[in-house]
Amino acid sequence: MELKIKKAELEGIYVDINQLPVGNIPEIALAGRSNVGKSSLINKICNRKNLAKSSSTPGKTRTINYYLINDQWFMVDLPGYGYARVSREEKARWKKMVEAYLSQREQLRGVIQLLDIRHEPGENDILMKDWLLHLQIPVLVVATKADKLSRGARMKHIAIIRKTLDLPEMPLVFSAQSGDGVEELKAALAELL
């Protein structure tokens, strides 16, 4: 099934999971370290430059951001985990919010876990993947920023990601800059939905 994105809009920004949209519209969530490229991925697959605000400053997304796609499903941008420069209390609040969302949200159809292709998965990446597996949530692992590496280096790095996360198959390779992986990602999204 081919997924064509004709319409995409920011539906809402939430700081509390009790405020999230009600109803049964399917949701696909994006999870990953701060600054891994979640906003850039949203903009690229929706073919919109500034739909999701991206920043070179880690920890820009501090809320759960809902994007309504084709009036049919939500893409949900979760706060990045990892090295955001915020207080311990703020990090704990984000963690609790994300954990509650992932464990309680009935509309959730799957999670796209993003990793920077240039770096070996860290402890938080491994914990996230294992936790999603424990919750039995379908996970698609996407290696972002592929344009930063040569084709040969890409293969080496995705093999490391696959081995470290103990994945049954290679992660999808994606670049918001070059457009590599866009169609493959849309096909994978269509399957999750």
Swiss-Prot record:
GTP binds at residues 32-39, 59-63, 77-80, 144-147, 174-176. Its cofactor is Mg(2+). The keyword Coiled coil does not apply. Residues 24-193 form the EngB-type G domain. One of its GO terms (cellular component) is cytosol. GO terms for biological process: division septum assembly. Mg(2+) binds at S39, T61. GO terms for molecular function: GTP binding; metal ion binding. Keywords: Cell cycle, Cell division, GTP-binding, Magnesium, Metal-binding, Nucleotide-binding, Septation. Belongs to the TRAFAC class TrmE-Era-EngA-EngB-Septin-like GTPase superfamily. EngB GTPase family. NCBIfam families: GTPase_YsxC. HAMAP family: GTPase_EngB (MF_00321). Necessary for normal cell division and for the maintenance of normal septation. PANTHER family: ENGB-TYPE G DOMAIN-CONTAINING PROTEIN (PTHR11649:SF13), MSS1/TRME-RELATED GTP-BINDING PROTEIN (PTHR11649). This is Probable GTP-binding protein EngB.
